[in-house]
Amino acid sequence: MIMPQSRLDVADNSGAREIMCIRVLNSGIGGKGLTTGGGGNKRYAHVGDIIVASVKDAAPRGAVKAGDVVKAVVVRTSHAIKRADGSTIRFDKNAAVIINNQGEPRGTRVFGPVARELRDRRFMKIVSLAPEVL
């Protein structure tokens, strides 16, 4: 569960290393790209949710710099994810992928496994870039 002030690792090569959640959006990918539903008042973000975040640590020559405000989709959480078949999955750390306003990743690679729930939320580009989908 990600809430404002939570810090997440960045699982792509956009240049950011760590981000801090500022806001959790009511969001998803609709027919015309990213839809945020006006921000909403969700308290927690789970896998597949979109957050607004501030870049806290960044690589020197990356596409994003420290202090930038970006949108990101949560791809891994340390809080267990319950699935319809009764199984649960959890990851060691919280991680996110930085996206643009159309819901596409800003980086060209995704590091580490991502949860299968991203496919249900229609983040197909992130799923295809990931080395493993759990």
Swiss-Prot record:
GO terms for cellular component: cytosolic large ribosomal subunit. CDD domains: Ribosomal_uL14 (cd00337). Keywords: Ribonucleoprotein, Ribosomal protein, RNA-binding, rRNA-binding. The keyword Ribosomal protein applies. InterPro entries: Ribosomal_uL14, Ribosomal_uL14_bac-type, Ribosomal_uL14_CS, Ribosomal_uL14_sf. HAMAP family: Ribosomal_uL14 (MF_01367). PANTHER family: 50S/60S RIBOSOMAL PROTEIN L14/L23, LARGE RIBOSOMAL SUBUNIT PROTEIN UL14M. NCBIfam families: rplN_bact (TIGR01067). Belongs to the universal ribosomal protein uL14 family. This is Large ribosomal subunit protein uL14.
